Amino acid sequence: MKVLQLIALTALVSSCVAASAADPSGLAKTKSDVDVLSRVLADHEQTNRSLRRYDLEGLDSVNSNREERNSITMVDDVVTKASGLVDDVMGKTDDVVGKAGQFGKVPTKLRDVATKNMDKIKEMTARSALVKTLTGRYDYAEKLSLSALKQLDDIEKVRAVDIKKGIKGSKETPDGMRRVIEPFEGMKVAPKKFLESHVGRADQRYGKDGSRLLSANVVMRLNDKGEKQILLISSSNPKKGDFLLPKGGWDKGEDVKKAALREVIEEGGVR
């Protein structure tokens, strides 16, 4: 009888230990851990019921102190392992909740980033719209900065007016290339003698090889928004999309620096 009781108890303890040793499969299978937890808790209750049944059947009749101590030790071990599994599952559950909380904060972080970079987003949107508008006429629009695109957009608006009015520059007269500008507040205009271009090339200088000496200048400024702007001179024909740096030939008595400055005044002239 004692042998049968010991075998039955050993089998019971082994089943409980096997249940308690069930491998939780991590955060991705939290539901499986909960199922394991349910089984362990149920097994623990079954263990108590089984112990009570064995008591009724005369478990107290066991006289061996050694056997009694071994049985109690095994039961304590089962309870300890079950308790440890409960703590492990609960800890992983808290970890899952914590990670879920972190994921819940992601939209807030995205909103913060979007707010901080709102100016960049607006700039990208404006640039994209201008590139789409200007690409038909300027195949290099995609490579230009937003500031350059804005200038081209303004020029296109003026060009449309010039074409409608039939305005076209002429190099036959000293002032034939100049546009009539209505005076505005703060307007600065160079003296008239500097605003008239030389007609013809009689007074221009040539190199030893017979080629005409040319000058060009890069004129840049910052507008009210801090954007860089470069002075480009459009073609005398408003239907063309050519833009060049202020350039021209050297006149007699001029060096490259003086010739370049004169061209800027002649072709720019108004500030």
From Swiss-Prot:
Family (UniProt): In the N-terminal section; belongs to the RxLR effector family.
Q: What is its EC number?
A: 3.6.1.-
SUPFAM superfamilies, alphabetized: Nudix (SSF55811)
Q: What's a Pfam family in this record?
A: NUDIX
Q: What is known of its domains?
A: The RxLR-dEER motif acts to carry the protein into the host cell cytoplasm through binding to cell surface phosphatidylinositol-3-phosphate.
Keyword Signal in the entry? The reply is yes
Induction remark? Expression is induced during host plant infection.
> Which part of the chain is the Nudix hydrolase domain?
212-271
| Taxonomic placement | Eukaryota, Sar, Stramenopiles, Oomycota, Peronosporales
Q: Which keywords accompany this UniProt record?
A: Host cytoplasm, Host nucleus, Hydrolase, Metal-binding, Secreted, Signal, Virulence
Cellular component terms per the entry's GO annotation: cytoplasm; extracellular region; host cell cytoplasm; host cell nucleus; nucleus
Is-annotated flag, keyword Hydrolase?
yes
Q: Where along the sequence does the record place the motif called RxLR-dEER?
A: 49-69
Q: Where in the cell is it found?
A: Secreted; Host cytoplasm; Host nucleus
Q: What PANTHER family would the database entry show? A: DIPHOSPHOINOSITOL POLYPHOSPHATE PHOSPHOHYDROLASE, DIPHOSPHOINOSITOL-POLYPHOSPHATE DIPHOSPHATASE
Q: Where is the signal peptide?
A: 1-18
This protein's source sits in the domain of life called: Eukaryota
Give the protein's function: Effector that enhances P.infestans colonization of Nicotiana benthamiana leaves.
Alphabetically, the GO molecular function entries are: hydrolase activity; metal ion binding
Q: Where's the motif Nudix box?
A: 248-269
Which organism was this protein described from?
Answer: Phytophthora infestans (strain T30-4) (Potato late blight agent)
Name assigned to this protein: RxLR effector protein PITG_15679
